[in-house]
């Protein structure tokens, strides 16, 4: 019995190559998908942490965008306190991500222990393809993480553990991401309409609320941006990218490089110029 358990745990330590032809969930960015061996491994646990609590909405939006790309039913599990502080998933916001609200089942629990148990049970259900658990407790036991990884591997369901802040604790997760809000723009008006308030950018990047801009603007034009760091990857290299979510294509794209002011040309001092004149 103990040896069998050890073999199962050793299997989790291998690169996140999914058996039974499940493959990976591509993000749509060639460099990232290559680093992930084709995409985010299905049948595995992945951790997504916000840079800080101020960026939790951005991390949430990143998770929702991944869920939108799967085009399947999903379960969202959150603690009562998290729902009270951050709000529940918001229908129009989900629609903007290409995630039909009827595909989502939301479950609220009282404690982080209940959340992890519910998440594990949901992973046993083959009727869903993604299970997202939003945990506020910074410390999650290694045993609980292993159980989640084993449950995901058995069912082939994609498991996302959403955290309010980064952690260095040992994990069986196939990948670990740290996500923050990047400056969002309105296409064609990058110079004048760039938003630099992280709280506003985070709300734009989340499907939890109405888009942060006024109704006088065409909110569908606003493309949320994410500063995504892949800090742990069992399948290959790590890296960091500024990603933009395209609602119309339901995929991530690399954000265009921000333009910078051209350096001033050398010119003669005003007094010298006057003398020459």
Region locations from a protein language model:
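Detector for small/aliphatic-rich hydrophobic stretches
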Residues: 1-76, 93-102, 258, 266-277
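Helical mechanochemical/support elements of P-loop NTPase systems and associated helical scaffolds
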Residues: 28, 59, 86, 115, ...
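Conserved inter-motif catalytic segment of the P-loop NTP-binding fold
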Residues: 73-129
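Acidic, Ser/Thr-rich peripheral helices and adjacent loops at domain boundaries
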Residues: 95-97, 173-183, 228-229
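P-loop NTPase motor core
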Residues: 108-180
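A cross-taxon signal for low-complexity, glycine/charged-rich
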Residues: 189, 193-221
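A conserved mid-domain beta-alpha-beta active-site/ligand-binding segment of alpha/beta enzyme cores
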Residues: 222-235
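C-terminal regions of RecA-like/P-loop NTPase motor modules
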Residues: 233-277
């Amino acid at each position: 019995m103990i040896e069998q358990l050890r073999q199962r745990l050793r299997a989790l330590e291998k690169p996140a190559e999914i058996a039974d032809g499940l493959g990976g969930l591509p993000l749509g960015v060639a460099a990232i998908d290559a680093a992930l061996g084709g995409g985010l491994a299905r049948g595995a646990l992945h951790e997504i942490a916000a840079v800080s609590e101020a960026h939790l909405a951005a991390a949430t939006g990143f998770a929702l965008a991944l869920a939108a790309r799967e085009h399947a039913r999903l379960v969202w599990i959150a603690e009562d306190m998290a729902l009270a502080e951050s709000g529940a998933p918001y229908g129009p916001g989900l629609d903007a991500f290409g995630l039909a609200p009827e595909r989502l089942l939301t479950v609220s629990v009282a404690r982080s222990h209940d959340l992890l148990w519910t998440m594990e049970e949901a992973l046993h259900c083959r009727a869903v393809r993604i299970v997202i658990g939003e945990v506020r407790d910074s410390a999650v036991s290694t045993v609980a993480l292993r159980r989640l990884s084993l449950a995901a591997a058995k069912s082939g369901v994609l498991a996302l553990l959403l955290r309010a802040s980064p952690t260095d604790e040992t994990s069986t997760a196939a990948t670990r991401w740290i996500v923050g809000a990047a400056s969002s723009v309105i296409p064609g008006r990058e110079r004048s309409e760039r938003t630099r308030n992280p709280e506003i950018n985070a709300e734009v990047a989340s499907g939890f609320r109405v888009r942060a801009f006024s109704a006088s603007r065409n909110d569908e034009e606003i493309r949320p941006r994410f500063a995504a760091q892949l800090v742990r990857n069992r399948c290959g290299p790590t890296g960091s990218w500024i990603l933009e979510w395209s609602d119309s294509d339901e995929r991530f794209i690399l954000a265009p490089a921000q333009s910078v002011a051209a350096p001033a040309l050398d010119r003669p001092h005003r007094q010298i110029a006057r003398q020459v004149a």
